[in-house]
Regions:
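Short, positionally conserved secondary-structure boundary motifs
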Residues: 1-40, 71-72, 95, 108, ...
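Short, hydrophobic/aromatic-rich segments at coil-to-beta transitions
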Residues: 30, 59-64
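A structural micro-motif recognizing beta-strand termini
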Residues: 34-39, 53-55, 67, 90
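Short, compositionally biased
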Residues: 38-41, 62-74, 78-85
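Short, well-ordered loop/turn sites that connect or cap secondary structure elements
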Residues: 43-44, 58
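Structural motif
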Residues: 47-49, 62
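Well-ordered beta-strand positions in beta-sheet-rich domains
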Residues: 49, 74-76, 96-98
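Glycine- and charge-enriched low-complexity intrinsically disordered segments
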Residues: 79-118
């Protein structure tokens, strides 16, 4: 029977984790957002902590925090060549949302990282 060699965590430690240094590029424009709901499952789970940067451009396929009226939501941004904007959920139980000119709509920031809790 083979036994794996004893692993010493200290042999692989690079140093202390500094989440501000490692995950935040624009401190004055970065916010943490806690996820409520399951529209982005299985990719993002309820309770996950999202790190959102307002200075990073949202591009096709970006996960974004958007505001429609007074409601904020996490969605995947889909930009069509004809200028149409769609907001997509990862969870197939939710229908896509087409953004129209009469909507009070804003991309509030781009999600850069998600911290999920086990």
């Amino acid at each position: 029977m083979k036994i794996a060699p004893r692993w010493q965590p200290t042999q692989h430690v690079e140093g202390r984790i500094d989440l501000n240094r490692d995950l935040i590029k624009h401190p004055l424009a970065t916010f943490y957002v806690r996820v409520e709901g399951d529209s982005m499952k299985p990719r993002i789970h309820e309770g996950a902590l999202l790190i959102m940067d307002r200075m990073v451009e949202a591009t096709e396929g970006s996960i974004v925090i958007v505001r429609i009226g007074t409601d904020f939501m996490v969605k995947k941004l889909h930009l069509e060549q004809d200028g149409q904007i769609w907001l997509l959920s990862e969870n197939e139980a939710y229908l896509p949302i087409q953004i129209t000119e009469d909507m009070d709509f804003e991309v509030w920031g781009r999600v850069m990282n998600a911290i999920d809790f086990l």
